[in-house]
Amino acid sequence: RGPDAPGPASKRVRTAYTSAQLVELEKEFHFNRYLWRRRRVEMANP
């Protein structure tokens, strides 16, 4: 979205992961390069 784009700019909220969650994400990523949104949400909200 450029500065001249019409309409309100909606930014996605970033998820802050704990160190333990990052380790789990890295393990998952090792086996599967793409983590579905559902899986990321599951890992973010234990």
From Swiss-Prot:
Keywords attached to this entry: Developmental protein, DNA-binding, Homeobox, Nucleus, Transcription, Transcription regulation
SUPFAM superfamilies cross-referenced by the UniProt entry: Homeodomain-like
Superkingdom of origin: Eukaryota
GO BP field: anterior/posterior pattern specification; embryonic skeletal system morphogenesis
Gene3D superfamilies associated with the record: Homeodomain-like
Chief location category: nucleus
Entry's localization field: Nucleus
Cellular-component GO terms for this entry: nucleus
GO molecular function: DNA-binding transcription factor activity, RNA polymerase II-specific; RNA polymerase II cis-regulatory region sequence-specific DNA binding
DNA-binding region(s), chain positions: 1-46
Function: Sequence-specific transcription factor which is part of a developmental regulatory system that provides cells with specific positional identities on the anterior-posterior axis.
Family of the protein in this entry: Belongs to the Antp homeobox family.
Protein name, per record: Homeobox protein Hox-D3
Lineage, top ranks: Eukaryota, Metazoa, Chordata, Craniata, Vertebrata
Gene responsible for this protein: HOXD3
